Each structure stands twice: as structure tokens, then as C-alpha cells.
Amino acid sequence: MSCPDLGLISVIIPAYNVEATLLKCVESVIRQTYQHTEIILVDDGSLDGTPDLCDEIASRYPSCMVIHRENGGLSAARNTGIDHASGQYLYFLDSDDYIGDIELSSLVHAANDNRADIVIGGFTKISESNVSEAYAIPDGSVSELNYWQRASHDKTYSRTEYIVSWGKLFKRQLFNSIRFDEGKIHEDEFIIHKLIADAQNVYFCSVSEYYYVSNDKSIMSNETPSSKLDGIEAYLCRSNYFLTRQWSDLAFDLLIQTKQLLLGVNDDIGDEDRTRFSSYLREWRSLYKRSVSFSCLFRIDGLSTTFYYLFPMTYRFLKELLETNGVE
């Protein structure tokens, strides 16, 4: 049974060397109970059979268009998809993932019923051993402040929902002045706070029909010093934004996480990365001074973060010493 037309959804699927998974991904969109969709396949300069497969899929399914471009990375591919989208809504789907039949219907009905500019669905993580685990946040609207408070306090894997772009339904107008930062890894981290800030209403939908396939090709599984530094930069940008909103507690919580990222960058990095690291450490220290409060010192993680602020080299040495001796 088809669903009523509540607005065209542009499903943007960047594709780079994914001939093994792309068809399953696209056909999961074709099978949606909500049929008012266009599929935008962005072939990002693939070197395998992906370009030909994209063309074959487009010839088979009229709702699918293909854009071939030079390799520019995930951000550039998504931006290309946005530029060609004609839908009222945008939905980002990674090419090695897939969605259940009611995913788009659930999200667009939630958007329509709650006048939401962003609807955030849950997801189901599929491990390499094919074990599935669902993550979802209960239905309901949230303010911008409450959104980030929840993100800060959620210590489970479901905190992923607060950061990533995939599995969310966005009003197209949110991207009138926002684009993914090209050349950056952790691209979602750089813009999600801007999107949440611009949205009139953000709604959580507890459906877990986005199937996130965890594999060793993922960015998180193949972190380089440069990609780690991109993650640090994104966290610092968001911490600074929180301070402009006078959310010092949220900024401090995020700086605690940033400290862990800083500690994850090894000493044996190149000169360019070392320069970036030094710059980010200085910025981290500046943000720490602006966000720390007396109450922070009554927290274990607050005390350890303060120790890192005062004695970063000593902290790193002691941490590595403890880890060498099997103490976490």
C-alpha cells in the first residue's frame, strides 16, 4: 500500500568503489512504502565497476539519476548531490548501508505531523559477524539546548545519532547556506550544530530502520593522524559555538572528549600535522579557561582534564606509563 505524497525526498547516495554493496543499498530505497523519492547517485571517481553499475541502475529505475565526478571525498560528493536535489527533503544514505521498507515513510510522517525541519531516526548496527543491535531515542521534539544536553549525557552507542548526517530527514532549505566541509574527515561533526541551530523543530523518531553496516573500511577503523586532527578541529569548533551560546557546561564536557582525542595523536607525526596539533592544543587550552567552573573540579574527569591543562606532557607520560603496565 503506497503512502500519501507528503513531499519529494531526495535520497543522496555517494558512491566510491562500492560495486559489492551499491545495488542492495539502492534497491532498499526502491522498496520503500513511501514512493515519492528521487535517488541521486554520486559516483565520486570510482576506480572499480561502480560507474558502470550506477549507469545500469539508473537505466533500470527511472527515479534514479547518476552524477559522475572526479574524486573529491565524501563531503564533495554529498555537496554535489545537494546541488542537484529537487526534493523538499534531503536524506543521506551511505552506499554500504541500507534501509528498511518503512524508514522514509516513518520519517516524513513524523516531519509532517510535528512540523519538524529535522527528523532523527534510530539505526540498527550490523557487525562484521552479522549480529544486529538496534539503537533509538524515544519519540519527541527537543530544543537545541536539550538536544546537546542529551548528546553530552548519552554514554551509549546511540550518541552516534546526534552527530551523523545519515539516517536523518532534513528540510532542503536548511542547506541553502550550509555545505559539508570539503577535504575534511568527520565531515558531519563540522556542520551538525549549524543545522540543529537553524532548525525550527527537531524531532526524534524511534524507528530503527537504517541499517548501519560496520566494517573495516570505515573512517573510524582507519584513523590517520590527519583524520584525528580533523576530529579535534570539529570538536573545538563546536565547543566554541557552545561558549557563544553561554553553554559553558556543555563546552567543558566536549573539551573532556577533545582531551582524549588529543591524547590519541602520537608523537611520530609529520611536521604539518605537528603544527596543527600544537595550534589545536593552544586553542583547547584557551577554550578550557573560558569554560571551566568551580563545580568542574568536583568531578573526576574534570580534575583529570585540569591536570592535563596544567601539565600536558606529564599527563601524557603518566598515561602512557600506566597503559604500558596494563592500567587503563
Regions found by a protein language model. Give the residues of each.
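Donor-binding/catalytic cores of nucleotide-activated saccharide
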Residues: L74, S95-V202, V213, K217-E223
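Membrane-interface aromatic/basic loop that binds lipid-linked glycans or pyrophosphate carriers
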Residues: G270-E328
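A conserved acidic beta->alpha catalytic loop
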Residues: S28, Q35, D43-L53, E70
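Short aromatic/hydrophobic "clamp" motif used to bind/position activated sugar donors
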Residues: L90
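Glycine-rich, basic loop-to-helix element that forms the pyrophosphate-binding segment
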Residues: R69-A85, S95, S106
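N-proximal low-complexity "stem/linker" segments adjacent to membrane-targeting elements
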Residues: M1-R31
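Short alpha-helix within the catalytic core of nucleotide-sugar-dependent glycosyltransferases
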Residues: L23-E27, P51-D55, G87, G100-N112, ...
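Catalytic core of nucleotide-sugar-dependent glycosyltransferases
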Residues: E209-N215, S221-F252, L261-G264, G270-Y288
